């Protein structure tokens, strides 16, 4: 049984450790640290740890206490959760890096002006993909009806989602709006992602029932799930402040509006 003195020493020195450390060992550890300070480096840290590891007796809880005592962390500890989060974040970065198109090759930098933040012009267009899709569309007519129902519908559903870039087009809307102090300040009209999300959903539902005619209910459900999740990817935008002039107190905001061109591909092809 643990005595009161041992419990108090353990709470003071090691509040998070679930192991039994006897009182003489705690006192010896304090003496060793005092000697280490008094002798000014004559006894090194390695010798101190060796002495402690030889005489330490650990009584731990089963399974998780053993893991915590010997490996210093379990799956449910704080260090392990941080490690898992870092792994998932790295996986997301890798997937986004290798699924999107190479932005360095497809984007050109604007000429820098005085007081203007350097931005990018997005030159990625889906016309090459539309041309490829229209060119090879008659090849699928050779397949029988069963093969077409199995492969062609999934091909036309998934291929634009995978091949087309996430943000194919960009559009900036600007206007003059009065500010609070009465002076006219040029600023961009901010279009909220929710409005864009509704527009994408309407474009999707406009031709969805005609496209999924003859598909099984399970496959139709998967079709809608894929489309609705894909449309959420287009609802990513940000407002950037730029041209901040303290003398004129003018704040020009820019909003990048990324249009969804994937439903347009379906309308043109189908």
UniProtKB/Swiss-Prot annotation:
Gene transcribed to yield this protein: ceqIR
Organism of derivation: Rhodococcus hoagii
Which keywords, in A-to-Z order, does the entry hold? Answer: Endonuclease, Hydrolase, Nuclease, Restriction system
Record's protein name: Type II restriction enzyme CeqI
GO MF terms held by the record: type II site-specific deoxyribonuclease activity
Which reaction is catalysed here? Endonucleolytic cleavage of DNA to give specific double-stranded fragments with terminal 5'-phosphates
Question: What EC class does the entry list?
Answer: hydrolase
Q: Name one GO biological process term.
A: DNA restriction-modification system
Q: What does this protein do?
A: A P subtype restriction enzyme that recognizes the double-stranded sequence 5'-GATATC-3' and cleaves after T-3.
Top-rank taxon of the source lineage equals: Bacteria
């Amino acid at each position: 049984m643990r005595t009161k003195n041992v419990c108090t020493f353990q709470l003071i020195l090691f509040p998070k450790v679930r192991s039994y450390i006897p009182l003489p060992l705690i006192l010896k550890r304090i003496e060793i640290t005092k000697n280490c300070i008094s002798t000014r480096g004559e006894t090194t840290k390695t010798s101190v740890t060796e002495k402690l590891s030889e005489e330490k007796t650990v009584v731990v809880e089963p399974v998780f206490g053993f893991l915590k005592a010997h490996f210093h962390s379990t799956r449910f500890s704080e260090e392990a959760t941080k490690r898992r989060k870092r792994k998932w974040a790295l996986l997301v970065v890798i997937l986004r890096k290798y699924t999107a198109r190479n932005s360095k090759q497809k984007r050109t930098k604007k000429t820098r002006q005085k007081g203007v933040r350097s931005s990018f012009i997005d030159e990625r267009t889906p016309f090459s993909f539309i041309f490829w899709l229209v060119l090879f569309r008659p090849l699928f007519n050779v397949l029988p009806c069963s093969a077409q129902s199995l492969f062609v519908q999934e091909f036309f559903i998934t291929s634009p989602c995978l091949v087309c870039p996430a943000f194919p087009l960009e559009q900036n809307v600007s206007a003059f709006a009065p500010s609070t102090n009465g002076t006219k300040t040029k600023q961009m009209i901010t279009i909220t992602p929710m409005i864009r999300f509704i527009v994408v959903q309407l474009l999707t539902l406009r031709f969805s029932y005609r496209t999924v005619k003859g598909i099984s209910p399970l496959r139709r459900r998967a079709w809608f799930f894929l489309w609705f999740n894909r449309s959420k990817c287009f609802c990513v935008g940000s407002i950037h402040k730029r041209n901040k002039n303290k003398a004129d107190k003018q704040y020009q905001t820019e909003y990048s509006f990324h249009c969804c061109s994937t439903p347009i591909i379906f309308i043109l092809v189908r």
